[in-house]
């Protein structure tokens, strides 16, 4: 419990919130679909904080890297690889939301991590 509270504190301290922007922990909570920081797994918080600092490069990542990041299901990762091979790089969030298995709501939640 102490560890998660420390992680939450550090995450909140590291991100400035101006009323419009969500903090790192708020972005993680939204992605994970939880209402409270205590409901987050500390491992997931560390992994996702790392992605906030070094976003996943979806146009360059291999299938294994896409799956390893933990943002996409196997189906979504395969679908993205297939899309890239047929159409080239994904150039916008709206283009990504058109990839099979994605959608505007999902892309909005993962956008800070990619």
Kindly give the residue locations of the regions a language model identified.
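Sec-dependent N-terminal signal peptides
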Residues: 4-13
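Long, solvent-exposed N-terminal ectodomains/accessory regions
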Residues: 38-39, 107
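Boundary of Sec targeting at the N-terminus
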Residues: 19-20
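Structured, non-catalytic alpha/beta "coupling" segments that mediate domain-domain communication
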Residues: 30-37
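Amphipathic, charged-and-aliphatic alpha-helical interface segments
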Residues: 42-91, 110-113
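Hydrophobic or amphipathic alpha-helical targeting/insertion segments
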Residues: 92-108
């Amino acid at each position: 419990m102490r560890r998660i509270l420390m992680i939450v504190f550090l995450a909140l301290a590291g991100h400035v919130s101006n009323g419009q922007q969500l903090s790192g922990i708020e972005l993680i909570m939204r992605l994970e679909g939880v209402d409270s920081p205590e409901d987050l797994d500390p491992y997931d918080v560390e992994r996702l904080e790392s992605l906030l600092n070094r976003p996943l490069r979806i146009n360059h990542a291999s299938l294994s890297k896409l799956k390893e990041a933990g943002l996409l299901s196997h189906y979504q990762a395969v679908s993205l690889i297939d899309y890239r091979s047929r159409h080239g790089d994904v150039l916008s969030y709206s283009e990504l939301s058109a990839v099979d298995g994605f959608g505007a709501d999902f892309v909005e939640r993962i956008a800070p991590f990619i």
